[in-house]
UniProtKB/Swiss-Prot annotation:
Belongs to the peptidase S8 family. One of its GO terms (molecular function) is serine-type endopeptidase activity. The gene is SUB7. It comes from Trichophyton tonsurans. Residues 21-119 form a propeptide. Glycans are attached at residues 58, 223, 253, 397. This is Subtilisin-like protease 7. Residues 1-20 form the signal peptide. Keywords: Glycoprotein, Hydrolase, Protease, Secreted, Serine protease, Signal, Virulence, Zymogen. Secreted subtilisin-like serine protease with keratinolytic activity that contributes to pathogenicity.
Amino acid sequence: MGFITKAIPLALAAASVINGAEILETRAGVQTLADKYIVVMNDGMSDKDFDSHRSWVNRTHRRRLIRRGAKAMGGMKYTYNFPTGLKGYSGHFDEQMIKEISKRADVKYIERDARVQINAIEQQDNVPSWGLARVGSREPGGTTYYYDSTAGEGTTAYIIDTGTDIQHEEFDGGRATWGENFVDDMDMDCNGHGTHVSGTVGGRTFGVAKKSNIVAVKVLDCNGSGSNSGVIMGMQWATEDAQSKGADKAVVNMSLGGAFSQTSNDAAKAIAEGGVFLAVAAGNDNVDAAEASPASEPSICTVAASTEQDGKADFSNFGQVVDVYAPGDGITSAKPGGGSQVLSGTSMASPHVAGLAAYLIGLGKGGGPQLCDTIKQMAIDVIQNPGSSTTSKLINNGSGM
């Protein structure tokens, strides 16, 4: 399936508290990374105090390695400092070090880092697609995509994924650029998922916003595998870059997720609070999306997958956190090296919404997280059997056809 990671049904388990800071625990079945943690600081912490805390962590970690003969651990790896205030870090620490960190009054909570990965369910080369036609039509079964010629011009879409083949003909030799890589040393999409997603957002043939610019933010490797800590670093980078260029002209797509993670949700909320629109795949386990992250974060736009017959895709998650449905079953888009492939999943639905957001920005319909409300208002009430407590709204670009 196109959605990155299998979202294991999970509510946040009871948290343990050691002299103050919560160490959030996950239920059996979640693939946590041994001795790797994400530490989130208290709200409102100053940069000076944050620097002081991290200096203390580095000093204490080195002391443990040298004086106490603790087993070798890498220590701090990523530092998070979102423009909207979320501060924290991730790293490789032994249990005793984590206990010492948890005793600090300036720590809000600690969460075990966990793995994310791709699981493909369908792939077929060079067949017709239907998703674009459905976005531009009020009736199913169309074969033409109707859209305004502005087509998202002047907007930027950040694709947090496996990377993008920026040389693909779909991106007109320049609209796609490389942003950052937080998973390996290969600035390429050696998996294919991210290129497909990028094509749906802004490809000249397959894209909803055909003139938008694409920025690749790689957080998953060739096997479609990565970590929450690396994904969050990609989220921070995209937010900062978008704000430096104009948050109201930017959208972010995350066709990825996993079991409930408070840190992932907090990072997604920070993107929205930074004034950037964020579309996220609801997940592919046919369960309530409230069990998945970052899909369960209410301030973002969570997208479920529909079929060509305007039904709920049988794999799609559902529930009150779903904002809209978008085409996600048998979607044709770009593949690395040229040409196209067909994939299914809420991963394919989400970029239709990110592309629609870029399209609406190009039309002068505003920008930022409030665009999700605009998209919901424009959507048409057609999804059959959408799932318990789930919207039946399918996205539409308002072309009137």
